[in-house]
Amino acid sequence: MWLIVGLGNPGDTYARTRHNIGFRVVSELAQRHRLEFTHKRAHARIAEGIIAGQRVALALPQTYMNLSGQAVVGLRQWYKIDPATELLVVYDDVDLPFGVLRLRERGSAGTHNGMRSIITLLGSQVFPRLRIGIDRPPPAWDLADYVLGRFTPEQEAQLPDIMQKAADALETVVREGMAVAMNRINAPPPKPKREQKRSSDAPDSSSDTNTSNASDG
């Protein structure tokens, strides 16, 4: 099975903040598969069901961000999972540009207090995670104020597409495994094809002479 945990803070006050993008993506995945958060256990709201033929539990910790590890450790014990292969944590990352997704099988917490809590209480950095870029704060901003602030209207308009892609990434992990998902999600976007143009000194194509094309740039 997979335990997929979205990180965030409970309550309407925080619902649309940058720090709650993990909540929103996991909720998007639940809505897509018509799973409802009807269970409460280990300080988390839980939706259980089947995705891509695999048993899954989707979790939204209710401990507030800095204590996320309490919920994750409790759920690990409840479901008897191996975090290295059956836990997937979804969270915001200020070290990635806005909207960029990155899948990793292990790693440090960086500046993220929720991840720091999970790593500390699990006693391991070895568990999969999906990081969602929210960009760095402006130089004069306090980090806490930034992550607890809302996205700009321009960013908010892009979020539905970003959350769809993030939910797609989670489905790929469940269906095909981390190796396939990482190759697909972490691959750089394809470079646009360079437009071909006729060399300025090439003969006109209407003539009987051969023409030549040169790459732009």
From Swiss-Prot:
Q: Which InterPro entries match?
A: Pept_tRNA_hydro, Pept_tRNA_hydro_CS, Pept_tRNA_hydro_sf
Q: GO molecular function, one example?
A: tRNA binding
Q: Which Gene3D superfamilies match?
A: Peptidyl-tRNA hydrolase
- What Pfam families does the entry give? Pept_tRNA_hydro (PF01195)
- Tell me if ATP-binding is a UniProt keyword of this record: no
Name the principal localization, coarsely classed. Answer: cytoplasm
Q: Which residues form the active site?
A: 19
Q: Which UniProt keywords apply?
A: Cytoplasm, Hydrolase, RNA-binding, tRNA-binding
Localization terms from the record: Cytoplasm
The catalytic activity of this protein is classed by the Enzyme Commission as 3.1.1.29
User: Compositional bias (Low complexity) spans?
Assistant: 202-217
Locate the region Disordered. 182-217
The UniProt entry's coiled-coil ranges are none
At which residues is there a site annotated Stabilizes the basic form of H active site to accept a proton?
A: 92
- Function of the protein: Hydrolyzes ribosome-free peptidyl-tRNAs (with 1 or more amino acids incorporated), which drop off the ribosome during protein synthesis, or as a result of ribosome stalling. Catalyzes the release of premature peptidyl moieties from peptidyl-tRNA molecules trapped in stalled 50S ribosomal subunits, and thus maintains levels of free tRNAs and 50S ribosomes.
Under HAMAP family, the record lists: Pept_tRNA_hydro_bact
Q: Describe the family membership recorded for this protein in Swiss-Prot or TrEMBL.
A: Belongs to the PTH family.
Descriptive protein name: Peptidyl-tRNA hydrolase
Q: Which organism is it from?
A: Roseiflexus sp. (strain RS-1)
Q: Identify the taxonomic lineage of the organism of origin.
A: Bacteria, Bacillati, Chloroflexota, Chloroflexia, Chloroflexales
Give the encoding gene's name. Answer: pth
